[in-house]
Amino acid sequence: MRTEKVLIDLRDLIPSDLPDGREIVAEGIALGQNVTIGESLYCKEKGVKSERQWREIAREKGIPCTCMNIGLSTWDETRDALENIYEDALVRGIRPPDRFNLIAERRMGLPKSKRAEAPQETGPCLWDEKDWWELTQTVPIQPEAADNMIGGPGSLDNVLDALKVGITCVGVLSQYTWRWPYWDDETTQVVSVVKAAGVLAAKKADGVVFDSYLEDGYPGVFHDYASYIGWAMLERYVAEDLIGAAYASSWGGLTQNPIIKSAVTLALEAVNPNRVPISFLQGDTIGNTPDFDANMAVLVNDLMFSKMTDLRYKLGTAPIAVPVTEVERIPDWKEIAQVQTISRKCEEYLPLIENTIDWRKIEMLRDKLVSGGRQFFNNALRILSDMRIDIRDPAQVLIIMKLLGPAKCEELFGVGDDDDNYLRGHKPVLETDLVRQTMEKRTALLSSIEKLGPEGLLADKTIVVASTDVHEFAKFLLTSSLESVGSQVIDFGINRDPEDIVKVALETGADSIVITTHNGVARTFGTILKKKMAEAGVCSSVFMGGVLNEDVEGSDVPVDVTKHLHELGIQTPGSLEDLLAALR
């Protein structure tokens, strides 16, 4: 029995000050009943009360909807970009995007009183009522209050502000597993999430939707697509059955194979009893390379299958066209507008191609994933119940799932035949594209390292490895490679603050600190880290890799900060081989 793998009493993970989640929901519903939902330009133009209402109309009429991600350095720049993208579509004679996901800065996840003092990262913050109002009143493109809106300790603040201006889809539930800058109060965070969800539940009859993006949570590092389905069922169980909100399971960015993507999308729809439209299908982000021209092929391949799946099965979703430059930096408005044009052009070809696809094979794969997902879900509730967790308390369920972590969740609840040759202890029903790619990279890296011979060993080195953000697999490749050359690796995890990294380096006597970063904070993070190291007398060498850029005043897009990092004394090796050479 997999319960034998639980070496602790799960009830010990529940904070002693955690209130009853049902009472939190009731408080949220009471708050929500006193909120008046505003009217957006988009909903006014469509003659509907909510985005969900229009999606349900559109799917029955066969009207394709589209979505885009946007979030430049400031809200003013983002607002101007929205106006330019909208005007560009009109000039080209195409339908503008239907919606945009605001990719806000991580500070938005904090309570309002904590945002100004937290370190700036990439993306806009909404600082006042005017900023919020402009979200829905600048152009008739419907916004989702997406990244960093629900999940953090500032969830309730954000939900109330979003509804008042006419935003009827708010996310991101999966981000409740994140850690926000300088925030370690688990109870306050989960209470804010659950209460915000209660507010959304109060507005379900008005078409308000509680959105998730699976890959931003634990599914992003799951090894099995069946676990994706099971996790979505768990989120829906909490959001719909326990809280009473309407739940949508958006997903897609970490899958390259279009057949698999269609099958997983259909599996998510199959476990969606209320047919809440999947808010968006994120475009493929792992097939892109620094060759922007080649990325056009990735874009079209991904869009065509997502759109055909949506059209054939009347899903009412909105695929996202990923700008071809996004692999290296945040795109500017012209690059976002470019792929909106491509997306609309793809729609002209859907009727010509859709009937040539053998959808039976995709449906068979869908059914296999649904079966595995249901088993994952049932395993989770059974094991939690066996361990005396109150599975009717949304706060308890959420916090236990978070504190178990992705690896333990999949080990305990995952399906497939038991097999210790696989990292999670059982053979996946369908291995994820990202895990497959990562393991292939790992094998190639370890093979390359093996050729270095004894002179490549770092057996006398203690190395702290950490990530500034949620990107788990880059850190996994680093730790695997460093362990293979004999280093004592201190895996300090993801979403770490510089002060905490310094403490660990001091406590372990680390020779080096290796940091992976992808959230536009390289310069600020590096500056604070080096300052705190000097104050603590830590002399470890520091290495940083990933996306080494940051927003700077006067630039529409983040700029490279490698030179600044070098001035701080932080090394930026361009490859793992270069890192190993520098560590020696």
Where are these regions (language model features)?
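Active-site beta->alpha loop and helix N-cap motifs at the rims of alpha/beta catalytic domains
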Residues: 8-11, 23-225, 551-563
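Cofactor-cradling patches in redox/metallo enzymes
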Residues: 479, 483-485, 490-566
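Long, compositionally biased intrinsically disordered regions
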Residues: 1-27, 337-452, 456-457
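Short beta-strand/loop segments at the ligand-binding rim of alpha/beta enzyme cores
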Residues: 137-148, 205-209, 272-283, 461, ...
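Active-site-adjacent beta->alpha loops and helix N-cap segments on the catalytic face
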Residues: 125-129, 154-155, 179-195, 256-264, ...
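Catalytic alpha/beta core domains of metabolic enzymes, predominantly
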Residues: 171, 176-329, 534-537
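Short acidic-hydrophobic, aromatic-tinged amphipathic segments that line or gate anion-handling sites
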Residues: 569-579
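ATP-dependent carboxylate/acyl-activation modules
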Residues: 434-492, 500
